[in-house]
Amino acid sequence: MQTAAGQSQELRVGVVGVGNCASSFVQGLAHYRDCRDNAPLPGLLRPEVGGYHVRDVGISAAFDVSAAKVGRDLSEAILAHPNNTFRFATVPHLGVPVHRGPTLDGLGHYLQGDVAESAWLR
């Protein structure tokens, strides 16, 4: 998207919880980034919404509580256990570290025995 002055405008997104949905979202951004505006795209209803194209979306921050994800680049963390989303795109190094988010409501019942909680900011 461009402003009235012709400058490129990026839509900045923060990811809270680097689970399977986040993995699919990040992979989707990488996969569809270079698609043509009017091309039919399997898996994506519209490449442009509200004047923003998929290529205009950039991730600026990411947060999780898992020791396997905190401190890693988001491109690596989306593949960490227990994520098991189908891998459909190669995500380049993003330069977005996953930060420790607060465990406000605890780990989910099914994750408690499967995920080591990060000690950072506990």
For each feature predicted by the language model, list its residue ranges.
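N-terminal glycine-/serine-/threonine-rich beta1-alpha1-beta2 phosphate-ribose binding loop
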Residues: 2-122
